[in-house]
């Protein structure tokens, strides 16, 4: 009876250990701090897809101190970010330079949507930022190593 009880206690412990080992440290902590990304596309809630002409013009870097820096086409900005729960994300106001970007730029669209980001998920090494009320999803990939 005692050996059966020990076995029953060890099986869940081993299962928990194995499942935790399958999650990378970044996913386990839920932290975006120290990561940098470039925009792949935006998929709107209405299935509209917007693809940047140059991914390198649309980047975001999450600092470990809760600061975020962004390049949004011809402008650069800084602001704050926080994640108060698993996969939750919220940006504070973004202080941006005010250059006029060329026609066809995704600048205005991204700036309008910035405050509506509410959650994120990292899947297949891509970062997906979801807007509130199914407004759309931004898909980012890691910045290439320099």
What label would you give each PLM region?
Residues 14-15:
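Short, linear, compositionally biased motifs with a strong N-terminal bias
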């Amino acid at each position: 009876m005692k050996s059966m009880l020990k076995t029953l206690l060890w099986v869940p412990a081993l299962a928990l250990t194995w499942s935790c080992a399958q999650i990378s440290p970044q996913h386990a902590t839920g932290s975006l701090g120290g990561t940098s990304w470039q925009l792949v596309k935006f998929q709107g809630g209405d299935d509209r897809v917007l693809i940047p002409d140059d991914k390198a013009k649309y980047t975001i870097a999450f600092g470990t101190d809760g600061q975020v820096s962004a390049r949004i086409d011809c402008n650069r900005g800084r602001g704050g970010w926080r994640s108060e729960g698993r996969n939750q994300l919220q940006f504070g106001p973004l202080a941006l330079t005010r250059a006029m970007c060329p026609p066809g730029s995704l600048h205005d669209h991204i700036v309008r949507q910035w405050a509506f980001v509410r959650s994120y998920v990292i899947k297949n090494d891509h970062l997906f930022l979801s807007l509130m009320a199914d407004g759309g999803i931004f898909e980012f990939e890691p910045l290439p190593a320099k």
